Amino acid sequence: VALLKTRARLLRDIRDFFHQRGVMEIETPLLSMAGNTDPEIQSTRTRDGRYLRTSPEFALKRLLATGSGDVYELGRVFRESEAGRSHNPEFTMLEWYRTGYSYYQLMDEVAALVRHIGRDKFSAWQVEKLTYRELFERYLGLDPCTADRAALASAAKRHDVGDIALSRRQWLDLLMSLVIQPALPGQQLTFVYDYPAEQAALARVRPDTPPVAERFELYLGRTELANGYQELTDATEQRQRFDAENELRSQRGLDVYRIEEHLVDTLEHGLPECAGVALGVDRLLMALSGAEDINEVIAFPASRA
């Protein structure tokens, strides 16, 4: 019962935060005709060929293009094959979009939300922002934007975290999750931004040397909590990314998903400049309550659903 009350208070605080800032709550469909083409995410498909959403992102962007203004959604999402201490195949996600915002401004709002919700716990925690490149240079002594697969594999070997054949992106993800993340400060909000271009997902790529994705992640202590973008607004580039992800899925022997044509059409007609972010509500509740396992903060986890 205490857990149910804590969760209810958390959801109320989230809604109060956005009400005070004039951001409108939206409900979008749980089922879609398109899947998530990201090869690191597996969508659940129904017998009639629809997919349970892995995020409300596509639908929220379609509303933004109609002139909805700033919006958020607080609801359930689904990702197959996700299980573990901080994963459940069905979980609660908070996602919101701010028109006219930069991703730097959105980082500040994410920090404000976390401190608002965890005012008794996180208000004294410092906030640090550093680029993905600065992070890797600090903890591994290498430049992730220029290091090749051999250099990344060598760094992994030095830390005893892998002796397998991986792509450059997979090596970066492995080093991030198994070497850097466990070494982050335990009581700090750490924002990591400007990712390598190959990790852009749906973020805009800035033509630096080398190019970087205008993307950020928030680590609450050592827990990955949120993932945000300066949103891509180019329809042609978005279609190319969907196609490239499906090609990679095919190469890995994964299901190839129907792409989100509605989103491509939306971008062709014009998506306003905006920044958006998704935040794991169950993980935030874990941090607030001191829980060590996501099963402790979900009334009906997969094992008991």
In which residue ranges do the predicted regions lie?
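Short alpha-helical functional segments enriched in proximate histidine and acidic residues
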Residues: F17-R21, I117, P182
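Hydrophobic face of alpha-helices
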Residues: R7, L11, R15, H19, ...
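A translation/RNA-centric and nucleic-acid-associated enzymatic feature enriched
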Residues: P29-G35, P39-L63, Y72-T99, P144-A305
